[in-house]
A protein has these predicted regions:
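Conserved AdoMet/S-adenosylmethionine-binding subsite of the radical SAM
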Residues: 55-212
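Conserved small/polar residues in nucleotide/adenosyl-binding loops
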Residues: 216-218
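N-terminal [4Fe-4S]-dependent radical SAM core
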Residues: 1-72, 79
Length: 218
């Protein structure tokens, strides 16, 4: 767990899973992959295996050791709902979050279909916890907007959108049931441009729907 996160919208990170695979354009310049691959082959380093998927069960209980309440971004270096993570392991992560209820957990995924299926079924016990926020990444219309629909169909108490990197105008989209949104562009070498009018469009949609909006990397 990192107690001092550089991510603007959270306090800390917790990574019981490491590594991921690309599934959509938003993954192209993945900061987590870039960081992890720097240490591939470095013996003893947490990312000795680079960005290959790895379960880290020894990290599961870390939130219990952190007594001061924090906003905790779950799996900043992975995606909890990717296919290689077993249902049983996801359930174990959910049980920790439910018990460590002095923290507020932020769970973000691009695998929105699996999120919806599990939280509507065996993980329903975690879905309605007000201290667990469930979110999806949205970068464009083709891949991002369907994730919003999946999230809206998920029986969660708190739903949020990470609209970053914003790669095109999202047009008109429904924000019913969404509690918070973040919008931002890419940063670093090779960052793809984000147009001001795209951000204004998202801002206007949030204003009309009374959804709080955080702007980053503008």
């Amino acid at each position: 767990m990192s107690l001092n996160s550089n991510i603007e919208w959270t306090d800390a990170t917790w990574n019981p899973v490491r590594g991921c695979t690309k599934i959509s354009p938003g993954c192209k310049h993945c900061y987590a992959e870039t960081f992890a691959e720097r240490f591939r082959g470095v013996k003893g380093h947490p990312y000795e295996q680079g960005f290959d998927l790895r379960l880290v069960p020894e990290k599961l209980t870390e939130p219990f050791l952190w007594r001061s309440p924090k906003l905790v971004f779950v799996n900043s270096m992975s995606d909890l709902f990717q296919p290689g993570v077993p249902d049983d392991y996801i359930e174990a992560v959910c049980k920790v979050m439910v018990k460590a209820n002095w923290h507020t957990f932020q769970v973000l995924t691009k695998r929105s279909e699996r999120l919806r299926e599990l939280l509507s079924g065996r993980m329903r016990f975690a879905a309605k916890q007000e201290h667990i926020w469930w979110g999806v990444s949205v970068e464009d219309q083709k891949y991002g907007l369907p994730r919003i629909g999946d999230l809206q169909e998920t029986p969660a108490s708190v739903r949020f959108l990470s609209i970053e990197p914003l790669l095109e105008d999202l047009g008109a989209f429904d924000l019913s049931g969404i509690n918070w949104a973040i919008v931002g562009g890419e940063s670093g070498p090779g960052a793809r441009p984000m147009l001001e009018k795209w951000v204004i469009s998202v801002r206007d949609r949030c204003y009309e729907s009374r959804v709080p909006l955080s702007l980053i990397h503008i």
